[in-house]
Amino acid sequence: MRRNYIREKKILCGDSYMAVGLYAITPQEHKARGKKQKESSTDQKSRNKVSSLRQKQRKAIANFDKYGFFLTGTFEEAFLPDDILACKREVVNYKRRVIAATCKRFGVSRDKIRVMLWAVRKGEAGRLHMHGFVECMGMRQSERREFREMLEDLWRRRIPGTNEYEPLGTMNADRIDMKKLLGNDGTTQGKHGTVGYIYGHKERICVESKNLKLPVEQPPNDTKWSRKQLHTACGDMQNDAYWWGTRFPGWTLEKCVVYDPEELHQSEQQREDGWEVTEPQCYVILSRKG
């Protein structure tokens, strides 16, 4: 009977990317995942936050590419929301305006417009503002230039009693940098990239369009990897693109993040010798070749 199980958990993120988690599991987990019995501890809640971050990053790379835009919207003092919920209402209204205006101006259907926005505040004394991603699928380059101007112009509010508008503040729409989104551009945004930067805000509420594609989790493979291969992946071959290409033919390494034991996955039941709690874990993002 096999004693050592290393789980390979693959998640397809749209047509172009795949995330893979590699970590040791117990024989009980290999047979079936048990029901959660206890409330999360503080440490586990912290891990759940990072897990949520990774899920959002996977969702972002499944839906947005270099033809989309990363948005940052700020408020002038006169329009600064009172709290995060009021900020969320402004973000929801902005999403509605973007979808309606895009359909009208470019003659596209709503399902072509993908939106993932956050109302955020960094720290208790920080100012409320907005970050997020927007993309309209199938646009020509000339249309994207016009779309970008429209995204910046729609950060506004109607002047009561008139048909005129005034800006809520500043809105910057920049082309999505996939290296920043993936977290492999070497900047201060860190290993979780743009989404990690957004999650660095103490208060945040996500507002999404309903048509976003969900990453697809594949059935786990618990017998493909050995402990020695896991150590190799987390050690000498962590950043070796050729080696990862041989492990996953047809895919190219984008990044590999090595975690301390139990940071990526924590076994709910430990085996007697407890070896799985001492094993390194890694999280890999790959892009499809061609």
Model regions: which residues?
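Right-hand nucleic-acid polymerase module
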Residues: 1-128, 136-290
